[in-house]
């Protein structure tokens, strides 16, 4: 059997992946905070872990993939205050947008998608456990984790006690015993979401939500914990502290995998620079399959530089692959992808190396080798491309079905929210692309003009 090796953030080494139970791999990835459109950085993380899960499913008999929805957060509260909408309206709409965008990038949904609001009881129970073990304390309606009680705190992210102290000195709350103590529970005023608890009406802190959802869905120790590199500190450092102190002897997560950052045209993506790109923006420029392919062309731990030129080049590469498949009348995929392709992916999810194998297979297929064409399709399908026939791709239908369905769903949501200007704009956008909508009692259908 091919051996997967992964760079483990915890040990700072690339290691052979050995799940606790080879018959059942358990994986958790931090999901979105649902208050706005998903941006390209969000998408990169989802595509990376979707690809890793595809590889794991190819090599192991059972994989349980959990990715949460953070639907309790001060950013959500602020957006509700800004727009006048209810928190429920905001989280429902933006969760729907997230699902539509990820589907347009051919990311399969996780096996379990817990929401923080669905696990308040688990969160309270975990906090009570930490208090009972002397690792947390109540103060002025808050509950805080006492970092001084965890000798391992800071080691995961490589921060010294001095660095941790320096980082915690900004706006230190008077109720904290130590400046670095972090919130597990905080009081909620009447106008914000809150739940009854032993410490009064309040809501959980962000970090405890993930620890509780992992324990509720996967148990004390999981095989892989993933997320973006920006979560290493404080989020993942704090998750480890909470979970390992609540369950002594537990590893919590055996392997930590982090996706690198994404920049646009060589600069950090930010609204102030005017280069902030949502998934929706980019799907208006290229098929979702091309966006996915671009996100896989850079190794997951490296910085990915997005540009319009890079997206166009990704589309051209896919054109070439589809030409190779077209030459063989869209062959059925081989029973298994070529070993060299799997070996590249198994080497710390080396997608650039795997894509080089796709090019070699396409070269051979263009020279008439039918087996290479079948291997090309099988390999591409494993990483989430070749979702269409060559004819569909070149007629533009690939842009297309997933994107059209996502826009129709967005239009429906806009109409429900009485945002008729947006609904009309979507209809006009689709009409300009030759897509005609027909609204009927059973919903909206579409056809090409």
From Swiss-Prot:
Entry binding sites for ATP: 271
Residue ranges annotated as motif 'HIGH' region: 32-42
Alphabetical list of HAMAP family matching this protein: Cys_tRNA_synth
Chief location category: cytoplasm
Official protein name in the record: Cysteine--tRNA ligase
Top-level taxon of the source organism: Bacteria
This protein's UniProt keywords: Aminoacyl-tRNA synthetase, ATP-binding, Cytoplasm, Ligase, Metal-binding, Nucleotide-binding, Protein biosynthesis, Zinc
Localization per Swiss-Prot or TrEMBL: Cytoplasm
UniProt record, GO biological process: cysteinyl-tRNA aminoacylation
Annotated PANTHER family: CYSTEINE--TRNA LIGASE, CYTOPLASMIC, CYSTEINYL-TRNA SYNTHETASE
Enzyme superclass (EC): ligase
Chain residues that bind Zn(2+): 30, 210, 235, 239
Family statement drawn from the similarity comment of this UniProt entry: Belongs to the class-I aminoacyl-tRNA synthetase family.
Any one GO CC term of the record: cytosol
Catalytic activity: tRNA(Cys) + L-cysteine + ATP = L-cysteinyl-tRNA(Cys) + AMP + diphosphate
InterPro entries with a match to the protein in the record: Cys-tRNA-ligase, Cys-tRNA-synt_Ia_DALR, Cys-tRNA/MSH_ligase, CysS_C, Rossmann-like_a/b/a_fold, tRNA-synt_1_cat_dom, tRNAsynth_Ia_anticodon-bd
Cofactor, free-text remark: Binds 1 zinc ion per subunit.
Cofactor(s) essential for the protein: Zn(2+)
């Amino acid at each position: 059997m091919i051996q997967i090796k992964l760079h483990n953030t915890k040990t700072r080494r690339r290691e052979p992946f050995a799940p606790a139970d080879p018959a059942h791999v358990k994986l958790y990835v931090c999901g979105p905070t649902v208050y706005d459109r998903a941006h390209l950085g969000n998408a990169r993380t989802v595509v990376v872990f979707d690809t890793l899960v595809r590889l794991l499913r190819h090599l192991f008999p059972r994989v349980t993939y959990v990715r949460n929805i953070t639907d309790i957060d001060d950013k959500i509260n602020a957006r509700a205050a800004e727009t006048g909408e209810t928190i429920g309206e905001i989280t429902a709409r933006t969760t729907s947008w997230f699902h539509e965008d990820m589907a347009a990038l051919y990311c399969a949904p996780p096996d379990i998608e817990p929401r923080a609001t669905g696990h308040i009881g688990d969160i309270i129970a975990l906090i009570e456990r930490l208090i009972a073990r002397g690792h947390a304390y109540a103060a002025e309606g808050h509950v805080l984790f006492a970092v001084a009680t965890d000798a391992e705190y800071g080691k995961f992210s490589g921060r010294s006690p001095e660095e941790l102290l320096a980082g915690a000195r900004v706006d230190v709350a008077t109720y904290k015993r130590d400046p670095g103590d972090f919130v597990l529970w905080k009081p909620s005023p009447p106008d914000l979401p809150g739940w009854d608890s032993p410490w009064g009406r309040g809501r959980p802190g962000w970090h405890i939500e993930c620890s509780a959802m992992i324990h509720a869905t996967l148990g004390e120790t999981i095989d892989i914990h993933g997320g973006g590199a920006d979560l290493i500190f404080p989020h993942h450092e704090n998750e480890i502290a909470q979970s390992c102190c609540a369950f002594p002897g537990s590893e919590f997560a055996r392997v930590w995998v982090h996706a690198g950052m994404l920049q646009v045209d060589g600069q950090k993506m930010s609204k102030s620079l005017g280069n902030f790109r949502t998934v929706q923006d980019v799907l208006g420029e290229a098929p979702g399959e091309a966006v996915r392919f671009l996100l896989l062309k850079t190794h997951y731990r490296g910085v990915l530089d997005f540009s319009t030129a890079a997206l166009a080049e990704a589309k051209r590469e896919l054109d070439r692959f589809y030409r190779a498949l077209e030459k063989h009348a869209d062959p059925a995929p081989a029973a298994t992808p070529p070993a060299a392709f799997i070996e590249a992916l198994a080497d710390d999810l080396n997608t650039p190396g795997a894509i080089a194998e796709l090019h070699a297979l396409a070269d051979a297929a263009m020279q008439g080798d039918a087996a290479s064409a079948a291997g090309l399709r099988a390999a591409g399908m494993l990483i989430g491309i070749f979702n269409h026939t060559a004819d569909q791709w070149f007629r533009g239908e690939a842009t297309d079905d997933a994107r059209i369905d996502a826009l129709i769903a967005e239009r429906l949501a806009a109409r429900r929210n009485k945002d008729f200007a947006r609904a009309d704009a979507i209809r006009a956008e689709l009409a300009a692309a030759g897509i005609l909508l027909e609204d009927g009692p059973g919903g909206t259908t579409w056809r090409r003009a």
